[in-house]
């Protein structure tokens, strides 16, 4: 439940689901509860699983964080033959020193990372291999399983010989590339005034421009109600080619006419139609077989 994974509980509850997330560092769970991205915390895996099952049975929207290593949660789900509808992972698997090996508390991991980083790396890679195998087993049992861009599969295959690690797809070929194919990508803006009202003013302009897009309308209305700003107030949404230009010109007009209190900074995201050549993420499984090409 770090910088990226921390968004997932709220994403799931915004779509009226039940989220069960493992996080080894308890303070991260507390932070997500404080910022309203997460609903409940458990320290016991079975209690967390039972709470998630109860919520699903009663069609109650709920997000749960359990203080444990991800592999321990996955193993317990398998032991109890509980198959999640959807399964993914956002641990820091791209960096062996940020990933937390099994059988260590967060505090023990911090000490080992400082005193013996090479042993730490090897333990991390061992756990990554176990992690991928558990995900593959849950996929085999029916869970819709995908990689969320942290290179967990690549680490398990390249450094621990898990040859079938890529049997579950990355999220880009599985879900995002159809959006890329029509030029749709993330469009984000931040209010330098620090006043949330400036973002709400921009939101309204986007609603006026793109009221015919039900997904965008739903997102903007829900985001205002449920997203807690961190740092400068900001918003992100997905717009298609040409729409981003319309939105930017409309926001520029708000600045020019003084309808917002200060400048609005507009940015893009590395996850985009013409972004990076990353064979295990943005350019995975390119149709022409050339996953080293950044755009097509």
Predicted regions mapped to residue ranges:
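Active-site/ligand-binding-proximal alpha/beta "capping" segment
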Residues: 63-91, 98
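Catalytic or ion-translocation cores adjacent to nucleophile or general acid/base/metal-coordination motifs
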Residues: 3-57, 90-133, 169-178
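Short coil/turn connectors at secondary-structure junctions
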Residues: 15-18, 58-61, 82-84, 140-143, ...
């Amino acid at each position: 439940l770090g910088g990226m994974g921390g968004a997932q509980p709220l994403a799931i509850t915004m779509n009226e689901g039940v989220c069960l997330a493992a996080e080894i560092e308890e303070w991260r769970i507390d932070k997500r509860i404080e910022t309203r991205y997460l609903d409940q915390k458990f320290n016991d895996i079975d209690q967390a699983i039972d709470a998630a099952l109860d919520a699903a049975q009663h069609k109650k929207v709920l997000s749960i964080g359990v203080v444990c290593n991800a592999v321990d949660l996955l193993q317990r789900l398998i032991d109890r033959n509980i198959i999640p509808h959807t399964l993914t992972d956002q641990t820091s698997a791209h960096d062996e020193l940020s990933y937390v090996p099994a059988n260590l508390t967060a505090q023990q991991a911090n000490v080992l990372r400082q005193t013996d980083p090479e042993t730490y790396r090897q333990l991390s890679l061992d756990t990554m291999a176990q992690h991928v195998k558990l995900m593959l087993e849950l996929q085999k049992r029916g869970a819709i399983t995908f990689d969320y861009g942290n290179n967990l599969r690549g680490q398990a295959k390249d450094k621990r010989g898990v040859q079938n690690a890529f049997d579950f797809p990355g999220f880009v070929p599985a879900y995002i590339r159809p959006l890329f194919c029509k030029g749709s990508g993330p469009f984000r803006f931040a209010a330098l005034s620090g006043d949330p009202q400036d973002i709400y003013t921009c939101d309204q302009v986007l609603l006026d421009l793109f009221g015919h897009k039900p997904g965008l309308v739903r997102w903007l209305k829900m985001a205002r109600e449920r997203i807690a700003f961190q740092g400068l107030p900001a918003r992100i949404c997905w717009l298609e080619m040409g729409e981003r230009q319309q939105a930017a010109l409309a926001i520029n007009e708000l600045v020019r006419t003084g309808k917002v209190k200060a400048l609005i900074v507009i940015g893009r995201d590395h996850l985009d139609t013409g972004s990076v050549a990353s064979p295990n993420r943005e350019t995975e499984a390119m149709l022409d077989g050339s996953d080293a090409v950044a755009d097509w």
